[in-house]
UniProtKB/Swiss-Prot annotation:
GO molecular function: ATP binding; formate-tetrahydrofolate ligase activity
Residue ranges crossing the lipid bilayer per the database entry: none
Pathway(s) annotated for this protein in UniProt: One-carbon metabolism; tetrahydrofolate interconversion
The encoding gene: fhs
InterPro entries given in the database record: Formate_THF_ligase, Formate_THF_ligase_CS, P-loop_NTPase
Binding-site residues, ATP: T65, P66, A67, G68, E69, G70, K71, S72
GO aspect biological process, one term: tetrahydrofolate interconversion
Enzyme Commission no: 6.3.4.3
Record-given protein name: Formate--tetrahydrofolate ligase
Pfam families tied to this protein: FTHFS
Top-level EC class as recorded in UniProt: ligase
Keywords: ATP-binding, Ligase, Nucleotide-binding, One-carbon metabolism
Length: 555
C-alpha cells in the first residue's frame, strides 16, 4: 500500500483564511498582521490578558531514533483531538531550523494528517524571524570587531571574546575561522567561529522575553567577552542593545498558522534542546494561554533535555505550572533501545521491546520527579504489531502509568481522542509541580543533580577549563543561574552509543558558557557541537522545486 508523503497531504489540504483562524479564538483583525492569506503575526499589545489563563500540556518523548519519534505530530494531533472534543485549544510550537531540514530530519511541522500548514513556508524561512535573529547576532559581532578596530576603548581582549557569529545551516567548516585578515584596513585579526542560529543567545533571549523592554534588558546583559584583566564586557558597555532590539521588533511577535484540521497554532522561536533550552517562546505560550483553555506545546527530544529545561528554565521565567505531560513512545525506538540495529527496526521483536522499555520507564519517572503525572502516547507506525503494542500497554498497566495508542498520523484528531481523554483526566487533578533544583545551589551541584537524578549517572567530572570557569562564574555572581545542559539526545549519558537506561556512568563537563542575557549557564558535555555538520547523504539530495514553484521532497 502506497502512503502519501507529508508534503502531498499538506498540498492536498484546504487552508482557511488566517483571519478566520484568528477569529475562532477571539483575535481581532486589529491585532492581526497578515503575511499573505494563511500566515500572520500577532500584535501582543492588542491581546487582552485574562485572569483564568489556559492550562499548559507539555509533550516530550523517550530517547529518540535519528528520525525522531513524532513529537510534533503528536502535539498537533492531540490539539486536533481536543478540538474534536469541542475544547478551546491552541498549539504552541517551535519554528524548524533550515540546517536540520536539509540535513537528516527533513521538515518539522508534524506529519501525516497531524500537520501545521502552510508546511512549505514554515520550513523555508517562514516569516523571517530566524533571519532577524541571525542578523542581530552577527550585527553584534560586527560591533565588537569595529570597537576593537576603532581603538578598543573598553580594553576587550580579542583572545577572550566569547561571542560567535551564527548561520541557520549545518556547516562544520565554519566551526573555527580567522577574521580580520588582510591588513590593518580589514580590522584586527582574531580567532572566531560560527554556531547554528538556534544555538544563538539571541534566540534564547527572544524565547524567554515577555516584551520589547524585557528583550532589550536581556540583550544588554549579554557577556560578549572579557577585558585583559578578566572583567566581563557586556552589550550595555557597547551601548548597542537598542539597535539589536530594533532588528528584532517584528521577530518578537508570535506567528499564527493552522493545523490541517483548522486548530489555531502559534509557531515562534526555535532553540534546539540538545545545545540550547529547546522550547518555543514564552510570548507565544502566554498569548495562547490568554486565548485558549488548553495550550499544547512541546520541548525538544526527551525528558532529559527539552522537558527538564522546560521545567527548570522556561517555567521559572514564565511563572506557570504545566498541567500535564505527554511522553511520546514508539515501538521502533523501544526496539532500538532493546538492541535492534537500525535496519531491522521494522521487524517484529517483542523481546527487544521488553528490553527497551527501561528507557521509556526512566523518562516516565523523570516527569514524576517534577510532581506532574505523565501520560504515555504510543505513536503508531505502520510496521508496529499487535503483540508489540500490547506488551507496552501491559507494562503501563502493571506500573500504573496512563497510556493511549495514538494514530494521529493516519487519522488526524480522531486518532488522538483516547489520548486527549487521558490528558483531560490529569488536567482536572491538582498536581504538586516543583523544579528539580533550587537556584541557590552552586552550579556544580545543580549539574550533579541533573546528571544523577535525571540521567541516571553516578558522577560528574569537570575538565580543568570547566573548573576554572566555575570559580570565575562564582566570582562574577553567576552562581544562581539555572543550568542548560548540552548533551547528545540519543542517550541519557554523554555517549550516544550507550542506549537503554544506563546507570553508574560518569559525565564530563568539558566547558561552560555564561549566557548572562538569557539567564542560564550552558554546560557542554562529551563531543556535543554548537554548529552541526551535514551527514554523508543529506536530505537535500531528495529535494527540488517544480517549475511553478512548489517544493519536492520536503519530508
Amino acid at each position: 500500500m502506497t502512503h502519501l508523503s507529508d508534503l502531498d497531504i499538506a498540498n492536498q489540504s484546504t487552508l482557511q483564511p488566517i483571519k478566520d483562524i484568528a477569529a475562532s479564538v477571539g483575535i481581532s483583525e486589529d491585532a492581526l498582521e497578515p503575511y499573505g492569506h494563511y500566515k500572520a503575526k500577532i500584535d501582543i499589545n492588542k491581546i487582552t490578558p485574562r485572569e483564568n489563563k489556559g492550562k499548559v500540556v507539555l509533550v516530550t518523548a523517550m530517547s529518540p531514533t535519528p528520525a525522531g519519534e513524532g513529537k510534533s505530530t503528536v502535539t498537533v494531533g492531540l490539539a486536533d483531538a481536543f478540538h474534536e472534543l469541542n475544547k478551546n485549544v491552541m498549539v504552541a510550537l517551535r519554528e524548524p531550523a533550515l540546517g536540520p531540514t536539509f540535513g537528516i530530519k527533513g521538515g518539522a511541522t508534524g506529519g501525516g494528517y497531524a500537520q501545521v500548514l502552510p508546511m512549505e513556508d514554515i520550513n523555508l524561512h517562514f516569516n523571517g524571524d530566524f533571519h532577524a535573529i541571525t542578523t542581530a547576532n552577527n550585527a553584534l559581532s560586527a560591533f565588537i570587531d569595529n570597537h576593537i578596530h576603532q581603538g578598543n576603548e573598553l580594553g576587550i581582549d580579542q583572545r577572550r571574546i566569547e561571542w560567535k557569529r551564527v548561520l541557520d545551516m549545518n556547516d562544520r567548516a565554519l566551526r573555527h575561522v580567522n577574521v580580520g585578515l588582510g591588513g590593518p584596513t580589514n580590522g584586527v585579526p582574531r580567532e572566531d567561529g560560527f554556531n547554528i542560529t538556534v544555538a544563538s543567545e539571541i534566540m534564547a533571549i527572544l524565547c524567554l522575553s515577555r516584551s520589547i523592554k524585557d528583550l532589550k534588558d536581556k540583550i544588554s546583559r549579554i557577556t560578549i567577552g572579557y577585558t585583559r584583566d578578566r572583567k566581563p564586557v557586556t552589550v550595555a558597555d557597547l551601548k548597542v542593545e537598542g539597535a539589536l532590539a530594533m532588528i528584532l521588533k517584528d521577530a518578537i511577535k508570535p506567528n499564527l498558522v493552522q493545523s490541517i484540521e483548522g486548530t489555531p497554532t502559534l509557531v515562534h522561536g526555535g532553540p534546539f534542546a540538545n545545545i540550547a533550552h529547546g522550547c518555543n517562546s514564552i510570548l507565544a505560550t502566554e498569548t495562547a494561554r490568554d486565548l485558549a483553555d488548553i495550550v499544547v506545546t512541546e520541548a525538544g527530544f526527551g525528558s532529559d533535555l527539552g522537558a527538564e529545561k522546560f521545567m527548570d528554565i522556561k517555567v521559572r521565567e514564565a511563572g506557570f505550572d504545566p498541567a500535564a505531560v505527554v511522553v511520546v513512545a514508539t515501538i521502533r525506538a523501544l526496539k532500538m533501545h532493546g538492541g535492534v540495529a537500525k535496519d531491522n527496526l521494522k521487524e517484529e521483536n517483542v523481546e527487544a521491546v521488553k528490553a527497551g522499555i527501561v528507557n521509556l520507564e526512566r523518562h516516565v519517572n523523570n516527569i514524576k520527579k517534577f510532581g506532574v503525572e505523565p501520560v504515555v502516547a504510543i505513536n503508531a507506525f505502520i510496521h508496529d504489531t499487535d503483540a508489540e503494542v500490547e506488551y507496552v500497554k501491559s507494562w503501563a498497566k502493571e506500573n500504573n502509568v496512563r497510556i493511549a495508542l495514538t494514530e494521529v498520523w493516519k487519522k488526524g484528531g480522531k486518532g488522538g481522542v483516547d489520548l486527549a481523554n487521558e490528558v483531560l483526566e490529569v488536567i482536572d487533578q491538582p498536581n504538586s509541580f516543583k523544579p528539580l533544583y533550587e537556584l541557590e545551589l552552586p552550579l556544580e551541584q545543580k549539574i550533579e543533580k541533573i546528571v544523577t537524578e535525571i540521567y541516571g549517572g553516578s558522577k560528574v567530572t569537570f575538565s580543568s577549563k570547566a573548573q576554572k570557569q566555575l570559580k570565575q562564574f562564582k566570582e562574577n555572581g553567576w552562581d544562581n543561574y539555572p543550568v542548560c545542559m548540552a548533551k547528545t539526545q540519543y542517550s541519557f549519558s554523554d555517549d550516544q552509543t550507550l542506549l537503554g537506561a544506563p546507570s553508574g556512568f560518569e559525565i564530563t563537563i568539558r566547558e561552560l558558557e555564561a549566557k548572562t542575557g538569557a539567564g542560564f549557564i550552558v554546560a557542554l558535555t562529551g563531543a556535543i557541537m554548537t554548529m552541526p555538520g551535514l551527514p554523508k547523504k543529506p536530505a537535500a539530495l531528495n529535494m527540488d522545486v517544480t517549475d511553478d514553484g512548489h517544493a519536492i521532497g520536503l519530508f
